[in-house]
């Protein structure tokens, strides 16, 4: 019985670590295709494990697309000068990043430029 418990514990630890490791990868994004979007912020989610920036941007035909941009965690962004009040509803920004390979309106943040020209750069996800 003790051996079974030990085998179960080791197996669970291995599976948990594999799931945690795969979650923090950036493989869902096309890192070879950098895009730049002029955006209007709709929501800024300062949450763990990742901060999300929700925004509207115009497509080439002039239609509004609703996007979600993933960044790193709040602790790491804080070290780069970000706060939970860095972005607000309606702020006009330029967002540079890598789109989802799936084609959905989701991207990984590389850089954000505020309306006054100030760049905000998170530490990159590897």
Where are the regions that the model predicts?
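Positively charged n-region of N-terminal signal peptides that target proteins for export
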Residues: 1-5
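Bacterial N-terminal signal peptides
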Residues: 7-19
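Conserved hydrophobic positions within beta-strands
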Residues: 37-41
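Short aromatic-glycine-enriched beta-strand elements
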Residues: 47-58
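Short nucleic-acid-contacting surface segments enriched for D/E, G, S/T with interspersed K/R
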Residues: 78-95
